[in-house]
Amino acid sequence: MTKPVLFSTRSSNTSEEGQLLVEQIWTGNDYRNFNYLIACPESGEALAIDPLEYDLCLATAKGKGWEIAQVLNTHHHHDHIGGNEGIVQATGARVLAHAEAKGQIPDMDEGLVAGDIVKVGKTVELEALDTPGHTMSHICLLSRSENAALFAGDTLFNAGAGHCKGGGHPDSLYNTFASQLAKLSDETLIYPGHDYIVNNLNFTLDREPDNSSATKLKSEIEKQDTNNALVTNLGLEKEINTFFRLQSSSVIATLRVSFPDLPEELDDQTVFLKLRELRNVW
């Protein structure tokens, strides 16, 4: 029996978001990946997101009585597409990804562009967001159901942002944050591609030592069971994620210590890019 996710709280790793079921699968691998199954409660049809540990995904679907009909890759990195073949061989699922990832993801069946709707079963509709930055052909999926949810891949992490060292660009990542992610409702639940939350909170506190929300959350989740991980929402991310806190006086003050030659007037993009530069070597 599923248990609803209330914003910014723990729940069982299966949650019910309006008219869809979400299964967050902790892989326990060295990459600290989360894999996801999204299922239609009426038909039992499921979509697998970045199913690197395909055996876990298949076993979970079987245990739930779900049938995986589609795979969605948020981007082309191996730790997100490495399980495609196993899922496809077992289920015949179709593989979806960003339209411009066609030459990077083997046996891709359908390319998505911004605004495309991915349908799962009878009730589930997910909007494709074109979210370049981590890579230039990255897709996030947005559910606009009763409890909005973002399946963020490696664009947005809990308390952090994706790096751009594997074919992306930090200017594009900033634009994705500023023009898309920051404009989503604060209630939007965040489902990232990896569990980096503790290290990301450490970075937030290095940049903004007086961030009481980050301090409190870190003390609460340092020893969390990642099989039952915290699900944040965008409102909480705006409190604890330094990449959303570009006008914080503390963030700017510590940034000036790291980069003494910064101009007196700083725009948000410059702050974001300098934070990303620091996080690259954190």
PLM feature segments, named:
Residues 2-13, 178-189, 196-282:
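Accessory terminal helices/loops
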Residues 10-66, 141-153:
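Conserved beta-strand hairpin/beta-sheet module of binuclear metal-dependent hydrolase folds
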Residues 31, 46, 53-130, 147-149, ...:
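Active-site HxH/HxHxD metal-binding segment of metal-dependent hydrolases
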Residues 37, 117-145, 180-183:
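Core dinuclear metal-dependent hydrolase active-site scaffold
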Residues 51-52, 76, 100-101, 134-135, ...:
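Active-site metal-binding loops of divalent metal-dependent hydrolases
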Residues 82-83, 139-141, 161, 201:
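Active-site-flanking alpha-helical
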Residues 160-187:
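Active-site-adjacent loop/tail segments of enzyme domains
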